[in-house]
């Protein structure tokens, strides 16, 4: 857009991610590796950067070392025009306490807003997999004249009970914001679909500051953006829904247009990986017109297949070696080794994993640097797996970081 206003983007990256345990045992949820070479936070940061928003504060808290390191190594966009992507930990500016909720995180970081003096503040989550052009949402927010716009994705009503749900009128004004309702509202044009909140918001700055200060003094508040701040604006008839289905990203196909996944559970995380590996994937990582950025792999050699090693319907990242082993329907991160006679099927292997000779790994997620001994079986005997590892409701076996099994 011409004459773009001053915008500050705040990414909420302090999530603990308990439902992704043990993948979050030693790292914040946005730092969890994803898709072979990425981390979850790379998706929101790529969307913002590709859209031209280059003043970004990433608010961190929970076990943030690997996240902070990733941002400093992969996202150095500083320049003479004041652009930056900065990791901002909890600083206890309002007393000796950590962030008590997502709204409190922004309240404690109001100095960032004071320094930048933005016209609008983008507040996005850090742990979803999707492509989006936020500038289109900003344009619609400005045109709406409302204090806040909430990105909504259309989902079938029967699936919407797990989300914050938006009821709106035909003009996009939000009339009610419901947290995980038993009977989700339909959209104005389709009673069988519901607007689920994506956790992405754009605020007019003055209105956001006032809402945060009012919320601070509310003893009954949980200080949560979705649970408290958005209803605050809805009650004042000052909230607008942005229909994500209208967001057109360059290079998107009809197959992956509107793709958005909340990967907050092991099963959702696993299924999202499986979305990547079909011939015509539901979510296409190879869209060069709207790339997902991350650390360069320039110092790693290409993946190598030797002694008859094969990979079918899989993604195999740089530095990996398949030596007389077989990989099917799987996603392998950097520096994975699959040895002679080993079989990996329907698995997600994170960096540095070693699969020993004759071992079998099926329907599993193996975190960084896991070593599977020769002849070991994972994902074959559910009873034995449950005695040793976490097994999700969908039967996905998860082996935590640095284990030798």
UniProtKB/Swiss-Prot annotation:
Coiled coil: none annotated. One of its GO terms (biological process) is glycogen biosynthetic process. One of its GO terms (molecular function) is ATP binding. InterPro entries: ADP-Glc_PPase, ADP_Glu_pyroP_CS, GlgC_bac, GlmU/GlgC-like_hexapep, NTP_transferase_dom, Nucleotide-diphossugar_trans, Trimer_LpxA-like_sf. It catalyses: alpha-D-glucose 1-phosphate + ATP + H(+) = ADP-alpha-D-glucose + diphosphate. Alpha-D-glucose 1-phosphate binds at residues 164, 179-180, 197. Its EC number is 2.7.7.27. Homotetramer. Involved in the biosynthesis of ADP-glucose, a building block required for the elongation reactions to produce glycogen. Catalyzes the reaction between ATP and alpha-D-glucose 1-phosphate (G1P) to produce pyrophosphate and ADP-Glc. HAMAP family: GlgC. Belongs to the bacterial/plant glucose-1-phosphate adenylyltransferase family. This is Glucose-1-phosphate adenylyltransferase. It comes from Corynebacterium glutamicum (strain ATCC 13032 / DSM 20300 / JCM 1318 / BCRC 11384 / CCUG 27702 / LMG 3730 / NBRC 12168 / NCIMB 10025 / NRRL B-2784 / 534).
């Amino acid at each position: 857009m011409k004459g773009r206003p001053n915008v500050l983007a705040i990414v909420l990256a302090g999530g603990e991610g308990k439902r992704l345990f043990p993948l979050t045992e030693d790292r914040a949820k946005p730092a969890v590796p994803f898709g072979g070479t990425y981390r979850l936070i790379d998706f929101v940061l790529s969307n913002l950067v590709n859209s031209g928003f280059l003043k970004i504060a990433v608010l961190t808290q929970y076990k943030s070392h690997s996240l902070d390191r990733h941002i400093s190594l992969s996202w150095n966009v500083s320049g003479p025009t004041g652009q930056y992507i900065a990791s901002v930990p909890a600083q206890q500016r309002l007393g000796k306490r950590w962030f008590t909720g997502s709204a409190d995180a922004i309240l404690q970081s109001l100095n960032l807003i004071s320094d930048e003096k933005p016209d609008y503040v983008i507040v996005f989550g850090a742990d979803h997999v999707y492509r989006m052009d936020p500038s289109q949402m900003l344009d619609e927010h400005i045109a709406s004249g409302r204090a806040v716009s909430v990105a909504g994705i259309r989902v079938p009503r029967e699936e919407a009970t797990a989300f914050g749900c938006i009821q709106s009128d035909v003009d996009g004004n939000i009339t009610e914001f419901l947290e995980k309702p038993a009977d989700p509202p339909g959209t104005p044009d389709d009673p069988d679909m519901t607007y689920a909140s994506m956790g992405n918001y754009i605020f007019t700055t003055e209105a956001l500051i006032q809402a945060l200060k009012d919320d601070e003094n509310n003893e009954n508040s949980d200080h949560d953006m979705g649970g408290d701040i958005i209803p605050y604006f809805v009650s004042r008839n000052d909230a607008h829904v942005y229909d994500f289905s209208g967001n057109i990203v360059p290079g998107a196909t009809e197959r992956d247009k509107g793709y958005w996944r909340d990967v907050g559970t092991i099963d959702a995380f696993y299924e999202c990986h499986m979305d990547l590996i079909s011939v015509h994937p539901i979510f296409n990582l190879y869209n060069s017109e709207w790339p997902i950025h991350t650390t360069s792999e320039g110092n790693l050699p290409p993946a190598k297949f030797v002694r008859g090693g094969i990979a079918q319907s899989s993604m195999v990242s740089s530095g990996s070696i398949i030596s007389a082993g077989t990989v099917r329907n799987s996603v392998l991160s950097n520096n994975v080794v699959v040895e002679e006679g080993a079989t990996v099927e329907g698995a997600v292997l994170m960096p540095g994993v070693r699969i020993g000779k004759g071992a079998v790994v099926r329907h599993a997620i193996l975190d960084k640097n896991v070593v599977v001994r020769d002849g070991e079986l994972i994902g074959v005997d559910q009873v034995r797996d449950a005695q040793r590892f976490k097994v999700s409701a969908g039967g996905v076996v998860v082996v935590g970081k640095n284990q030798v099994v």
